[in-house]
Regions:
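Catalytic loop of short-chain dehydrogenase/reductase
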Residues: 87-88, 92-134, 145-147
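The beta1-alpha1 cofactor-binding region of Rossmann-like NAD(H)/NADP(H)-dependent oxidoreductases
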Residues: 18-30, 61
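C-terminal helical subdomain
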Residues: 141-142, 160-235
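Substrate-binding pocket helix/loop in short-chain dehydrogenase/reductase
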Residues: 55-56, 63-65
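A glycine-rich helix->loop->beta "capping" turn
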Residues: 10-13, 33-46, 52, 138
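Conserved Rossmann-fold SDR core element
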Residues: 40, 122, 132-144, 186-194
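Hydrophobic positions on the long internal alpha-helix
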Residues: 30, 45, 78-82, 86, ...
Length: 235
């Protein structure tokens, strides 16, 4: 509920709900409650994720199932039941926090189960964007170029030292905001990188997004080799 409190302190309105995206009935109920409270649903962000960076040999099936139920299936279920609400509004967007479909061995070999689950979210983008294009519902993916200073990085993927090589979550928030302010029919089926998309929208200074400006930034997983950072900008 802390996120809801922060939203309301900033002048927004929030409806905090405890939702397990693996439970279809709970998802449907949450969407209905949200639509009733706010008069509709304009935007859906699929960000729920489970992670285990383990090899096939070291991944137990319970962990495998959890990642696929939350990442791929959860994204599918939430998006599926949000469609009837989104079709009723003027500028509907579905956004997955998932990577470009760069299907390379290097992304799978160290952690096949996680990569399958994460790319599963992106496959929903690929299919659903085509399915909903004629209905004017935008479906896109957003992925960070660098690691982002989140609890997952701090607690699971490198600790405080790694956090210093990250950008702040603000860059993803700003990129998402720019996506949602774009007419849905003009932006769909895209796999967007945060700083590249912001650069396309006129942002040229990315220095303030750094956690520690003195440290080199660390790249995130799944970044395609041909995805160059924006030219001539302060990263």
């Amino acid at each position: 509920y802390t996120a809801a409190e922060e939203i309301e302190r900033a002048g927004g309105k929030a409806l905090p709900l405890v939702v397990d995206v693996r439970d279809e009935a709970t998802v449907k109920g949450a969407l209905d409650q949200t639509a009733q409270k706010f008069g509709g649903i304009d935007i859906v962000v699929n960000n729920a994720s489970a992670i285990s960076l383990t090899t096939v040999a070291d991944t137990d099936m319970k962990r495998f199932d959890l990642m696929h139920q939350i990442n791929a299936r959860g994204t599918f279920v939430v998006s599926k039941w949000a469609i009837p609400y989104l079709e009723k509004v003027a500028n509907p967007h579905i956004l997955m926090i998932s990577p470009p479909l760069d299907m390379k061995e290097k992304w799978f070999a160290p952690h096949t189960a996680y990569s399958m689950a994460k790319f599963g979210m992106s496959l929903v983008v690929l299919g659903l964007a085509g399915e909903l294009r004629d209905k004017g519902v935008a479906v896109n993916a957003l992925w960070p170029r660098t690691i982002i200073a989140t609890a997952a990085i701090k607690n699971l993927l490198g600790g405080e030292e790694r956090m210093q090589q990250a950008r702040k979550p603000d860059i993803m928030a700003d990129a998402a905001y720019a996506i949602f302010n774009t007419p849905a029919r003009e932006l769909t089926g895209r796999f967007l990188i945060d700083d590249t998309f912001l650069f396309e929208r006129g942002v040229t200074d990315f220095e303030h997004y750094r956690v520690d400006p003195t440290k080199d930034l660390a790249s995130d997983f799944f970044l395609p080799a041909d995805s160059a950072p924006p030219p001539d900008v302060h990263t």
